[in-house]
Each structure stands twice: as C-alpha cells, then as structure tokens.
Amino acid sequence: MKTVREIEFNSKTVLVRVDYNLPMDENGNIADDNRIRATLPLVNYLVDKGAKIVLASHMGRPKGKPAASLSLAPAAKRLSELLGFEVVFVDDCIGPKVKERVDQLEPGQIILLENLRFYKGEEENDPEFARSLAELCQVYVNDAFAVSHRTAASIVAITRFVREACAGFLLEKEVKCFHDSIENPVHPLVAIIGGAKVSSKLGALENMLNHVDALVIGGAMANTFLKSQGNDVGASMVEEDLVETAAHIVQEARDRKINLILPVDLVVADRFDADAQTRVVDVKAVPQGWMALDIGPETGAIFARAIQRAATIVWNGPMGVFEMKPFCNGTKMVAAAVAAADAFSVVGGGDTGLAVNLCGVADKMSYVSTGGGAFLHLMEGKKLPGVTALD
C-alpha cells in the first residue's frame, strides 16, 4: 500500500477522500468534530507540500438525493476555523462547474465538495461517477478508514481512473494499529467484545479465536452465551437462533485452551428505562420478567483482572446500556481497567469510542479507532475494499 510520503505533490491537484460524516445537534451544529481533527495532519502536510487540495466526503444517508440537513457546508466552516484560513465549499461534487472551480485552485488552497451521496453512483460504486471524480485530480488519497469497508465509487472504483493513488496518514495508522494488535500482537492478547447482538459480532468472535489468549464477552450479547450454558436470563434480550452457535464458540475456546470469560453477575431491571427498579443478581438468579442491562460489579472485577494480565488489548462494544446512568458502571470498570493496563490497547470505533470519551480515558488508550464498521470488518479477518483498491 503506497502512502503519501512516496508521492511528489508540488502543484498537483489532489482529491482526498475523508470521512466527515459528523454527528449534528438539533440546531444543525456539529456535535463532535473529532473526524475533522483526525484529518488535520494530512491536510497540513499537503498544504506544506504545495498541493491543490480537493476534499470529498459523504454524510448520512440521503439515498442519492440532495438534502439540506446533510450538506457538508458546516464541515467546511469548521475546518476553516481549525486551519485558520478559508476552505472553499462547493455546492456540488461533479460536473463542469466543479471542474472549473478546481482548476482555479492555487497551491496550498483547499476546496470541500458537497456530499458525495447526493448522487446514487457513490454507493453503487458506479464507474461513471468515479470517473467524474477522478477528472478533478492528478493524485487520489484515501484517508477515510471508517468507510473503507464499503465498496463505494470514491473508495474503490475511482482508483481505476487516477494516475496515482495512495493511503493518507489516518488510513495508514489504522491499518498498522490493527496489524500490531491482532495480526502480530505481543501476547497475551485479550479481546473484549460487547454490544447488543451476537449476530453483528459473530464473524469477529469466530476469527478472534484464531488470535487471542483470552476472550471477554459482555453487553447484551452475553445473554445469548449465558443461555447457551443453561442459565435462565429472564426477559433479557437473547438471539434464540444463535444459542447453539454461542455454545459452539464456548466449546471451541475450551478446546483451544482460550480463557473465555462470561459474566457471573448482572445488573437487572424490571423494564428498559433509566428510572426502572434495578438489582444486582447472580447469572443463575435473574427474576422472571426482569432484563439484564449491564454486567455486575463482581464481573467487572473479574474482567479487570483478565485485562491487567494482557500485553495487547482489543476492545469492541460496551458492557451495558451505558447511555443510561444506572447501566454504565460495567463499561466504566472495563474502560478504567484498559486505561490502567500496561498494554498496547486498541479501541474500536462507534459506541466503544464514544464510551471511552464519556469515561474520560480516551487519552489513556494506545489508539481509538475512527471506524466502527471498518474496525469490525478487520476483526472478522476480512480485507478492506478501500485498502485492496490501493494495492
């Protein structure tokens, strides 16, 4: 995979695929600008090298039609503020008017194009849409790890039509961190997998058995595993069609002498509500009609001990419904343990990234990934289409 350090950029027009798919508040303001900040090292590097910079991104799911609420104009404004000079926003992403504006760029100047997904061709990996984007540049840079698991025109097809294509700093760093944490880790390697559904993490669970020394399972998905071991989990969320699969994973871990750790106690509630009645119970004593919404304190302590023994930690998925105060302690205990561990720690994006930020320990992790789906894709042992396209 070629990187930006291997390319001469002076006076060349560069199209950089970034991920500015930003969370917005109810007033249309950016709620979190971390994804913009993550691209600043690359943007500043290209400015210093005298490139003419065209930034391209999607935002949300407009389904091939323009939607004012999903415009990237606020991203251009915020990037201008962070850089200290104007980033020009163009209200389209392909066509003669866009090409004309790009041709007017001077070295060190930046344009941000409008939302790529305002055209159906982006998500369809349409070669004609990709060709139209490629006509805007001499060099293509992919710095959008978080969408590199998608076969999109600006991620995959575009590489067939540009003279030079390479990875940006963020994509390069993400791929390297993944390699160092899973494909070539310092052992013991402990994977912590949580979240709601076994079905969404099944590929990751099965692939992790090929790499880990210990596998810690929390979140609502643990209910399916607990049921597979003969526990009655009351009204807790269980994927009945995957109970047998969960039992197979537990047995597979035993056969491979992998320490698979399940909860021993749970925080249960009489309903799914922040104001619900709650109790801490043993996994064998969940009351009928009650549901598990977090791991219990004894489980948190057991998980923490396993984490402390690790030399490498990979964490994807919260331990409970951490957005509700009564059910956030399990995630907090795990976050604190990972932060305190003398280990190389990589945290998957999405909810887990949000959780470590809320717990105030993001800066104690070795790396917090910018990608949820892309990170999971790698955990499943799959190649990223966006990375393969650069080879």
UniProtKB/Swiss-Prot annotation:
InterPro entries, alphabetized: Phosphoglycerate_kinase (IPR001576), Phosphoglycerate_kinase_N (IPR015824), Phosphoglycerate_kinase_sf (IPR036043)
Protein keywords: ATP-binding, Cytoplasm, Glycolysis, Kinase, Nucleotide-binding, Transferase
Chief location category: cytoplasm
Reactions that this protein is recorded to catalyse: (2R)-3-phosphoglycerate + ATP = (2R)-3-phospho-glyceroyl phosphate + ADP
One GO term describing the cellular component: cytosol
GO biological process, one term: gluconeogenesis
Annotated binding of ATP, by residue: 201, 323, 349-352
Protein name from the UniProt record: Phosphoglycerate kinase
Native source species: Desulforapulum autotrophicum (strain ATCC 43914 / DSM 3382 / VKM B-1955 / HRM2)
